[in-house]
Each structure stands twice: as C-alpha cells, then as structure tokens.
Amino acid sequence: MKKYINVAIDGPSGSGKSTAAKGLANKLGFLYINTGLMYRAYAYFLNENNLDINTNETACIEAIKNARFIFNGDDVKIDDQDVSDILRSNDVAMLASVVAANAKIRNLATNEQRKIASENNVVMDGRDIGSIVLVDADLKFYLNTSIQTRAKRRLAQNKDIEKLDYESIYNDIKERDYRDMTRDIAPLKKAIDAIEIFNDNMNLDQCVAHLYEIYLNKIKKS
C-alpha cells in the first residue's frame, strides 16, 4: 500500500509552477522537489566542463555520475559550490532544454525523482511529472500562463542577474515552448487526469491558496 502522498505540478517555463509548488509544499509540510533545477544543474555543469551532450553523450553521463549534486528545494550545490543563483539565468535555461531532451539524462534524473517520491510526501514540479515521472501521483496540476505574462515575470526576476529586454525573453520562451512540446523524449504536455490552472491573473498567494483548496477537496476527503 502506498505510504506517501505525491503531488505533481507541471507547466511551461515561467508559468510560476516552481514558486507555487514550493508554497504549496510549505503549506502542507511536504518535501519540495524542483526537477527543473536538476536539468539546469546538469546543463551548467556540462557547459562549464566543455562537454556537449550532442557530441559526447557517454562522457557527459559519466561526468554527471561522478560529480556530487545536492538538491534542497531551490538550493543547489555542485561539488560543494553553490550555483543556485547562476542556474536561474536565461542562458542556463536554454542550455537545460537541450540537455533535458537527452534520453539517458532524463532516465538518470527520473529514477532519482521516483526514489525521492517513494520515500517522502512530496510536491514535485517539472514538465513531465504527472505524465511520466509520477503517473500514479495522488493529485496532478498543470499551471498555464500566457507567453506575454511569463516574459514580464522573467524580466522582473532576472533584472539583477543579467541585462535582458522583453522581446528577447518573449522569443526565448516561445522557442523553448516549441522545443519542450515537440521533443521526442518526455515532451511537455498536460496529463490526462491533471487539473489545469490558468494563473495570469493570480498572484502567488492566490495561486497557492487555490491549489491548497483543491488539495483539501481532493485528498482530505478521499
């Protein structure tokens, strides 16, 4: 019999799923797992070591296996170096989309994510959590937001990290959406049993409160 409660939250880049997932996890007292940071960490690590997943897959996989990655919510360390802020840059986001399309890397990450979920009450966010990683999750959400709103949010979030303009961010998000939705391996899509939430007109507190209310209605009453 299943011992732990798993909540899956999926959605496109910049939809606020990670922030909402963290807020919901805190409200529930659950472990929060940001799977997107795993792929960003892998992408950053490979780029820093001049390794290209498209030209030297074996070396990339071995390098990742031999490195020490520590994931704790939004905090990430690679071989004891804190890279949490670096991973939020737009450049790393684009690199991560390419790395995440690799089947062997996704398999490596998916196995780790499933192991964590089997040992904890978790709120896990990503792009294929409800459809691939945790198909038996107790509750699945799909957060959706217009590209315009996502671009404005990312511009505000990254203003102290890098100099970007709205148009370049908009185009990057549009390109990433296309890649994520059309890739052969674990494409971004809403699980058939996921509850879709459009959050353009919600602030963080409203979004978390809405997810929490649904959780109480779906899980607590079951």
UniProtKB/Swiss-Prot annotation:
It is found in: Cytoplasm. The keyword Kinase applies. InterPro entries: Cytidylate_kin, Cytidylate_kinase_dom, P-loop_NTPase. Its main location: cytoplasm. Gene3D superfamilies: P-loop containing nucleotide triphosphate hydrolases (3.40.50.300). Keywords: ATP-binding, Cytoplasm, Kinase, Nucleotide-binding, Transferase. Its EC number is 2.7.4.25. GO terms for molecular function: ATP binding; CMP kinase activity; dCMP kinase activity. It catalyses: CMP + ATP = CDP + ADP; dCMP + ATP = dCDP + ADP. GO terms for cellular component: cytoplasm. ATP binds at residues 11-19. GO terms for biological process: pyrimidine nucleotide metabolic process. Belongs to the cytidylate kinase family. Type 1 subfamily. This is Cytidylate kinase. The gene is cmk.
